[in-house]
UniProtKB/Swiss-Prot annotation:
Upper classification of the organism: Bacteria, Bacillati, Cyanobacteriota, Cyanophyceae, Nostocales
Enzyme type, top EC level: transferase
UniProt protein name: Probable RNA 2'-phosphotransferase
Described function: Removes the 2'-phosphate from RNA via an intermediate in which the phosphate is ADP-ribosylated by NAD followed by a presumed transesterification to release the RNA and generate ADP-ribose 1''-2''-cyclic phosphate (APPR>P). May function as an ADP-ribosylase.
InterPro entries on file: Ptrans_KptA/Tpt1, RNA_2'-PTrans_C, RNA_2'-PTrans_KptA, RNA_2'-PTrans_N
Domain of life, source organism: Bacteria
Organism (species): Trichormus variabilis (strain ATCC 29413 / PCC 7937)
Key word Cytoplasm present: no
Family: Belongs to the KptA/TPT1 family.
One Gene Ontology term of the molecular function aspect: tRNA 2'-phosphotransferase activity
Keywords for the protein's UniProt record, in alphabetical order: NAD, Transferase
EC number: 2.7.1.-
Gene Ontology biological-process annotations: tRNA splicing, via endonucleolytic cleavage and ligation
Pfam families in alphabetical order: PTS_2-RNA
Length: 182
């Protein structure tokens, strides 16, 4: 499958598995799962046919690992980034000492004042490495990277989760745990 087609499918899946499942007539089960057959049927009935092979290729080749299959490969979900109410059934995790967050330069004043807020999402997304954070930041303009004192936050009572694709999730990062790197 061509790269352009993979990107188009990935964007379509992101939109409907994270934000608007109801537009395809889908209901996310606990954990954010939806039956693969149900998804493929819904896509076809909404003039966006996807084959099982296409779906498998998008899941396995997505560099950000946005999606995953369950153990039986009969269900699929978006790993994080939902704006719709969903319980991903993630377990609390001990974070590494430092995590990173990439953003655009225009967001810096608000972040320095209020910290990192989840906005329309369920969690703030944090990366394990600077390069991933920089890649995220570039999507928002000139990138700015913040380091996050994750272990200090954890020791102060904040709960961290880690999604299937290795992104750490937390409800909020107050400004006192943030350090602008660049």
């Amino acid at each position: 499958m061509e790269q352009a087609r993979q990107v188009k499918i990935s964007k379509f899946l992101s939109k409907h598995l994270r934000h608007t499942p109801e537009r395809l007539g889908l209901v996310l089960a606990p954990g954010g799962w939806v039956a693969v057959d149900e998804l493929l049927s819904a896509c076809a009935s909404h003039q966006f046919p996807i084959s099982r092979a296409d779906l498998e290729q998008v899941v396995s080749n997505n560099d950000k690992q946005r999606f995953s299959f369950d153990e039986t490969a009969t269900k699929i979900r978006a790993n994080q980034g939902h704006s719709v109410e969903v319980d991903l059934q993630l377990q609390p995790q001990l974070p590494p000492p430092i995590l990173y967050h990439g953003t655009g330069e225009k967001s810096v004043p608000a972040i320095l004042k209020s910290g990192l807020l989840k906005m329309s999402r369920h969690h703030v997304h944090l990366s394990k490495d600077i390069e991933t954070a920089r890649t995220v930041g570039i999507r928002h303009g000139k990138p700015v990277i913040f380091s996050v004192d994750a272990m200090v936050m954890y020791q102060s009572g904040f709960t961290f989760y880690c999604s299937d694709n290795g992104v750490y999730l937390v409800d909020h990062v107050p400004p006192e745990y943030l350090h602008m790197m660049n």
